[in-house]
Amino acid sequence: LFRSTEISVTLQAARRYAGSGRVITIFQPHRFSRTQQFAREFTQALKNSDLIYLLDIYAASEKEIPGVTSELIVQAGDERFIYQPSMISVVESVASLAEPGDVILTMGAGDVTALAPAIVTALSERFA
């Protein structure tokens, strides 16, 4: 369960670790009801990142709520917030933009963590 406090603390630690590097976050909101209730809090917490990719909401067997999408978080953010429903596109984008020293985080309670190995592989190929 990711709430805004946990996100903020994690991103503060990532910022310290990154030093002069960037913090790139891939966030997958968990449940439509939580996204509806906490969209602004998520946006504020995620602002500690230099670049934020928002995947589609991980429903976790919850029914869709009309009008509630990850774009609520993106719209409350700024130009650093990017809605990207395609996991393949996120991997390609992060792998093409990341530089040595950047910290890349996957956050969420869904299948977002499955992206980490693909990102590592893509970066390994790029910087080989």
Regions found by a protein language model. Name each.
Residues F2-A128:
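ATP-dependent carboxylate-amine ligase
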